[in-house]
Amino acid sequence: AGLLDILGL
């Protein structure tokens, strides 16, 4: 999670 949540991945 983290940047992946922002990117929607």
Swiss-Prot record:
Modified residues (Leucine amide): L9
Subcellular location: Secreted
Post-translational modification: Rubellidin 4.2 seems to differ from Rubellidin 4.3 by its C-terminal amidation.
UniProt keyword list: Amidation, Amphibian defense peptide, Secreted
GO annotation (BP), single: defense response
Cellular-component GO terms for this entry: extracellular region
Tissue specificity note: Expressed by the skin dorsal glands.
Keyword Secreted: yes
Keyword Secreted: yes
UniProt function note: Shows neither neuropeptide activity nor antibiotic activity.
Name of the molecule in the record: Rubellidin-4.2/4.3
Organism encoding this protein: Litoria rubella
Record lineage: Eukaryota, Metazoa, Chordata, Craniata, Vertebrata
